[in-house]
Amino acid sequence: MKFKQDFFTQLPEFYAQVYPQGISNPHWLAWSEDVAKLIDLQQPTDALLQGLSGNAAVEGASYYAQVYSGHQFGGYTPRLGDGRSIILGEALGPQGAWDVALKGGGPTPYSRHGDGRAVMRSAVREFLVSEALHHLGVPTTRALAVIGSDMPVWRESQETAAITVRLARSHIRFGHFEFFCHSERGQADKLTQLLNFTLKQHYPHLSCDLAGYKAWFLQVVQDTAKLIAHWQAIGFAHGVMNTDNMSILGDSFDFGPFAFLDTFQEDFICNHSDPEGRYAFGQQPGIGLWNLQRLAQALTPVIPSDDLIAALNQYQHALVQHYLMLMRAKLGLAERADSTAEQDQQDLELIGRFTVLMEKNQLDYSNTWRRFGQLDPSSAHSSLRDDFIDLNEFDAWYQAYQTRLGKVTDIEAWQQARNSVNPKYILRNYLAQEAIIAVEEGNLAPLERLHQVLRQPFAEQVEHEDLAKRPPDWGQGLIMSCSS
């Protein structure tokens, strides 16, 4: 790997230098060829294994943990930072630079009495979800590899340490700006310094002045809205939408007790530590705005409040428009040129009626959408009908749907288009759990198989049909712990 060290050299007060502590008996558990190409890596070598496991130095790496704060479950925590993630620097590749981080690389000054380690199950889950979301077309950080060990660590019980090698376009979070506004009061110069760095690195078309800052914040609002529209359309619950887990670039970031929906449930909670459902699936759009408001609050020393409010007021429109675009594609509805607010509302109601039907009839979210690939939209009798209990309610919806759809001339092309946006394969929690159990037993084949299938989520892959089925009773709607 070839590195540049812009964050390390230009923002010395934004991190602590810390070196990883190696794990014993490191070995590859997973490797992504797709991600390796992003930073010009060819294959997983033993020398690379030693470097990424913290047992040897990586040439050109600087090793540091960033400091930030954040709102966690609505309350402000003044000092967080990378408690177990150590960044090597920005690795250069054909499509630009990527931060390379060792998640689980050992304790840092921000570990807050933690051991700085990640357990194998959480490392595997982060690897799988990073790659699954990417191949579904959802903005996300990436995962190069999972490195296992025989090092014991203790959570609810004894587990084994592992490292996820994460790649990110940037590790700058909402919480970085919060730290230098709230926790380090009177540090407006640091906010400006961080803003200028962010613009030069990721928004070079914007000027480092008030006009540029205003345009940048509006872009953050729009990117965040688009990200959450993706989550809602694909049926993804993040689980821990704290402001320190929000990427400034609108990428899915810092995965813990996430879940893809099995049976559609608007109020689904995937996080065992969230009994009140603050971060439930249906709450994510509102939390996205709440988090942006916290970011705006942190930016008031450098951007006037009126300008911040004006940008925040664009959030709902951006969210709805992107959500409509994604959902119209899932349903096969033509995009309306210059659609009116009334027409958009009609489409939202049509979509909402269908998801309510899915919830009332306890239908699998992804599999139901996939069925549109076999639907003859010109037929008065829908092949979906047998999935529903309340046939009168479904028939009323289907009639409204056909009216909005209009005439379809090439049914086969229409069906293929539905299969290109409605995935057959998603990372169901029970599939991840089965792969983790197999790894614990020394069998990497299920993990590799699942990884490869998730690289082509829209393809039929008939030899892997079992991975597209609804989960068994034990695997339905699994709720995960935050411990990792």
From Swiss-Prot:
Provide the E.C. number(s) assigned to this enzyme: 2.7.7.-, 2.7.7.108
Signal peptide, first to last residue: none
* A GO term for molecular function: AMPylase activity
Binding residues annotated for ATP, in chain numbering = G81, G83, R84, K103, D115, G116, R166, R173, D254
Q: Where is the active site?
A: D244
Report the superkingdom from the record: Bacteria
UniProt xrefs under InterPro entries: SelO
Q: Keywords in UniProt for this one?
A: ATP-binding, Magnesium, Manganese, Metal-binding, Nucleotide-binding, Nucleotidyltransferase, Transferase
Q: Which Pfam families match?
A: SelO (PF02696)
Provide the catalytic activity annotation: L-seryl-[protein] + ATP = 3-O-(5'-adenylyl)-L-seryl-[protein] + diphosphate; L-threonyl-[protein] + ATP = 3-O-(5'-adenylyl)-L-threonyl-[protein] + diphosphate; L-tyrosyl-[protein] + ATP = O-(5'-adenylyl)-L-tyrosyl-[protein] + diphosphate; L-histidyl-[protein] + UTP = N(tele)-(5'-uridylyl)-L-histidyl-[protein] + diphosphate
What positions does the entry give for Mg(2+) binding?
Answer: N245, D254
Enumerate the cofactors the protein uses: Mg(2+); Mn(2+)
Family membership noted in the UniProt record: Belongs to the SELO family.
Q: List the HAMAP family hit by this protein, alphabetically.
A: YdiU_SelO
The protein's name is Protein nucleotidyltransferase YdiU
Q: Which organism is it from?
A: Shewanella sp. (strain MR-7)
